[in-house]
């Protein structure tokens, strides 16, 4: 204790002992806490001397802080003690531990802010905003986004389909990008238009919000000063690239790129939530799920979380363990908080589920009954063996039970002076009998240090160097290797050896440590030795430095001579010879495969097969079994998949097929390694070319051993003569969904080293087809091809000579390749009198294939023939248009057309032509009349479109195709005037992409047939249109009202809401002049017409298009649905004049009947009968009884839920006692016979029996101050308060309600004979038929809500300590970064209240993640306090 007493002295020690352990506590810090802290520091391998200075304390806290979240109570207590000691050293005045922690946190925040400001100042000095870079002249220059980046982005979207990984990938790829670059990235996404529309909406919202928060300054911009960017400037629509660069590099800068990027990320977050709504909190390990798979899913989702790195680290430390299954969680917690991910995965390997429990049980059993002894003799068929005595050599008993005299010396080594239990020598164990070492340890020989790392092969192969270099053979084998005999293991590897000049036959045994020979005379001295052998121990003579010659190779080492049943060459000699075990069938690593979670393998019965098919399948399977591709299995495998056979095309041979459809449904999904096939137009011209084919491709790759059982199939016997023969696959089966992906992945890994060693060789790989090109001379090229074939053969992949193409033309992937040109393989279109659906499908497929090099191919009319549900064998008559189209295609295909190869030094040019009937054709070339490839486009992505939109879609398709094939986009030549294009594109900048392009005058030119105005047309008539339909009876109405008093309503049958909205617009266009303004509330109709279609699949939309073309000018606008929102009086008139009013007629009658009975206010009727507010107010206004003094206004008084005000009022000479619940305005009232204390007390007790009454507030009337009332209040536990005499405001609520009650009584008095009846009717109307005030509730609904809320509040307050155990991570405002952890103060249905540092915030529930903090049960200094309480 004295050793650390010098940490504090004098005044500092006094200050230390004045500080309390926790706020409001009695205990103070003492000297013993310093001693405890110094000892704890030694436990954590920290120098206790650091406690003597404030700098040392700061270093300790820096070390401890990362572990606080998951640390023990002792660790947190140590941190709190050091923090308090730091404040004492720094002379910071604190009263307790919590205050010390707050002071340190405040100091750290200030330090962090200074660091960030310094970094920001450094960044401001130079432009960090790549791709904006500074050139030699000091100017800021923009480098356009590269084709490689665009290609990577397109692949990400296509492969991931807006899964969470898309956001970090976008963030990484768009680092420092300008808005123009970001738009280029977005617009390369050709598909996913729904997602792009969502993104566009988000950007528009953010741009509008920017404009609202950054209003334009009045007056002109000063000379030399940049204008401030608007929302559309940031989005890149109304700003130039130079303006964007200037804003980004100005002083001070406006980072328009980063702002726009933030908007896009907000939109991408919405899209990701829609496409894959997975939170990190939802990632939990299944009971049988391997820990590795769980970790993969966890980190995949964690990468997509928008949170700081500190938060992600916390999630990894806490959630990864917290959400593991119980088996893994037990192991992980035992590892402790500092375990690395590698340690976790190693510890949890193979853990989980029944299999794990079975292994644990088996392990326990094996320790009890160790039967892991392998016998060498071939007649031993199991672990059972005959026991033999080591003492006398007889069988049937053990040495410890032997009655014979005990042999002298040790039974293990034969030496005297010790027993076997004390023997230190290790046995030879060359027969792998685990007599001395139950765990199976093998003896290490002296030559074991020279052992080579053997590659895994399935045959014994001897490698070596020079025959004469004996020492090098044993010590240094790094030289060039020579091939020696390969010995298969189908039989025992016996070889002839020469030892001591004598020839012997010996067994090469890689499991034996030593070389043991039968009785043979050897030169030199020997020493006795005892080794473990068959049937016990045998005595041998040990000769050192003996020369042995095996297969022409020589080795020197130790040889044991004794009564061995077979000569053994052990590893001490084999390693010197360089002998290795090799596996030529399949050295490829297997890819682990599993079934989908919760699914079992297929159990489909075998179909009936004919005799010839059974014989054919039997022969095929026998051959496959001999080759090791399949293995026979027994009845223990419960799975089955049907198998059948078909004859090969143009052959008498049979082909085996397995119907893996059921297994494919149950197998987990694979990512396709390649998105499509390589295209010859992307090939660079090469001097020498070869095309290879991998033989039996799938059968060269092994299948995961654990998955093989699911591929089981059965070959039945004829007439069920015998049980069916059962097999399972050892290799990738044909027809299984995983085979293509695993094969492609395996082939890529195999080719990787060859590609790295031969960068001058280009290899295009698709499935089993290989294109190999180089600029080498033909001789050198063919030598490299042989190297490649040998490389593939080493891995078990053969390349048959019959498919080895050495001379052009090369047939590859359906193409025909020549040295300087390419084409598709010859296409013959069939001549038929009648065409089936299947024939036309094949015909369209051939024409589509030909269209990539033959320009002008069309298939639209042929495809129309296939519309509708038709059987494949149905006869389809060709229409006149289809026959014409087919004849044109035949003409095109008559002349062979060739494409050229790609030259990287030249630009790509794409030219598009319109063919009519929504069909387009295009050519991509680098030199005129030398096409790289051609194609067509004929899709209608929407039901309503126009030529400009179709042209932009074709441009997108070509650009995407170009990025995939060449990695860059071409320059476009388009048949459209620049003015026409820009007029349409202005409103669709986000949906389409504008590449570099130029006008080409190739008729027919594309044009817009009409254009909508941007602003209302002055002087033109305005039509307010609307439509509505009943879904059940399909009846509807459409109509309009104009600002000039005209109106029209038509009834429509068999219609929908959307059709009536369009019908209303059609009526307005039909009845209007050449110029018209139209206002609609339908986003559907607005979206169709604003896209300016000139053709549609809808007849009604075509009629609207015809009307629009006839008009000179049209303005179309949208307002929210016709409910008076935004003060649109004209739309309200439309509602009340016909269209909407028709829909409310039934409700109006019911509301009027209700009002005549109860005189409900307008809010109650609007809510109950779904009336527009204007209609409900009109009903109240037309009631003479409700217009005496206008409608009473109600307010909310901020009072406790248990407070009531009581008062007596008089009407018709009678006394009415009224009680009002202050918080809700709810009334209880009764006519009482007399204003006495007895009657009042009785009323109070009835009130207390119905509602929770805590306080009653009355005036000083004689009945209220009577002893009877006081006694009733005392008994019921009610506190009574009195108002101020002669001041009616102190009873304001009940006084107001008295007037309201009398007014309602006046409205219903004629409906009741007695006053007491009218009073109860008025109470009912007030409590349940009048809505208003906070929440728009009635008083009855409000009091129930307030009481229920009060109960919930009290229950939640009881759990406040539990709530404080939770931590909250939240997003603030529009910032996508997660903040936290913060302290949870309150959790409601819609929002939570949290405390972050000293700030208390209310955050919507959808923007928070609430997580239990398992690391510490008590916060702050409590841990320290509890620790000290134990002392």
Swiss-Prot record:
Interaction with Gp41: annotated segments: 7-31
Region: Dimerization/Multimerization of capsid protein p24, residue numbers: 275-361
Region spans: Interaction with human PPIA/CYPA and NUP153: 187-225
Motif (Nuclear localization signal): 26-32
Positions of the record's site feature: Essential for RT p66/p51 heterodimerization: 984, 997
Region annotated RT 'primer grip', chain positions: 810-818
Binding, Mg(2+) 1: 693, 768-769
Lipid tethering residues (N-myristoyl glycine): 2
Binding positions (Mg(2+) 2): 1026, 1061, 1081, 1132
Protein name: Gag-Pol polyprotein
Organism: Human immunodeficiency virus type 1 group M subtype C (isolate 92BR025)
Taxonomic lineage from the root: Viruses, Riboviria, Pararnavirae, Artverviricota, Revtraviricetes
Gene: gag-pol
